[in-house]
Amino acid sequence: MSVVRLIIEYDGTPYVGWQRQPNGLSVQQVVEEALAKVCGGPHSLVSSGRTDAGVHARGMVAHFVTPQPLPMAAYREGVNRFLPAQIAVRDAALMPDDFHARYSAVGKWYRYSIYRSPVRSPLACRFSWHVRTVLDLQAMRQAARLLVGRHDFAAFRASGCAARTTVREVFSVDIVDAEEWVYVDVRGSGFLRNMVRIMVGTLVEVGRGARPPEEVGAMLAGGCRKQSGITAPAQGLCLMEVAYAPQDCVEG
């Protein structure tokens, strides 16, 4: 059996998320159906994680197992022929037998996009959070530094999160000032459900002056969701990259 890895980009706006759901169309379902047309039969994708409804991805990683792999071009160009405009396979590679999209991952990079302007942008609204108020980026950076490291992020998870442990390691939180745009780049070993969006919502509240930066430390220590900030809207979040230890492709 051979392991094929796909890197998938998608606009999550019209989907219920990455994972198959009984109540709507998911990115996983659409990609698996396109893959079945190319391969002549069903293949189940195992992803590096899941994204919620409305969240986007530049670098979602998924793998599947097949007894007779096709040329990698068939999984790129071939599958893309059957995908809608909102989804594309960016890369395909034949991997070592022990590669696993989820369990081989050593880190993830999420970017949250904030559009700051008194007037909304129709061209940006699908991929950003429109914030009309002025943001104190220095205060946001001060608060962001407190989130870096290995902590119990119980205060930064969704109420329905069923993770066995709420301890995670955040490698970095960078606030990037780009004229009308503010990007919050978060890198870590892994994240709880809605963790990045709650982190961003909290940082925006700090930037608006609604909370002092040092309050973030109390949130981490308290572990109560009610202490932390709002959950930033889904459309501003994008999974940029999933990191793996150096590993040679068999073919790609």
Curated annotation (Swiss-Prot):
Q: Which GO terms describe its biological process?
A: tRNA pseudouridine synthesis
Please name the Pfam families in this protein's record: PseudoU_synth_1
Q: Which domain of life is it from?
A: Bacteria
Disulphide bonds annotated for this chain are none
Q: Where does substrate bind?
A: Y110
Residues of the active site: D52 (nucleophile)
Alphabetical list of SUPFAM superfamilies matching this protein: Pseudouridine synthase (SSF55120)
Q: What InterPro entries does UniProt report for this protein, alphabetically?
A: PsdUridine_synth_cat_dom_sf, PsdUridine_synth_TruA, PsdUridine_synth_TruA_a/b_dom, PsdUridine_synth_TruA_C, TruA/RsuA/RluB/E/F_N
A GO molecular-function descriptor: RNA binding
Q: What's in the keyword line of the UniProt record?
A: Isomerase, tRNA processing
Q: How does it assemble?
A: Homodimer.
Family indicated by similarity: Belongs to the tRNA pseudouridine synthase TruA family.
What job does this protein perform? Formation of pseudouridine at positions 38, 39 and 40 in the anticodon stem and loop of transfer RNAs.
What is the protein's name according to its record? tRNA pseudouridine synthase A
Q: Which organism is it from?
A: Syntrophotalea carbinolica (strain DSM 2380 / NBRC 103641 / GraBd1) (Pelobacter carbinolicus)
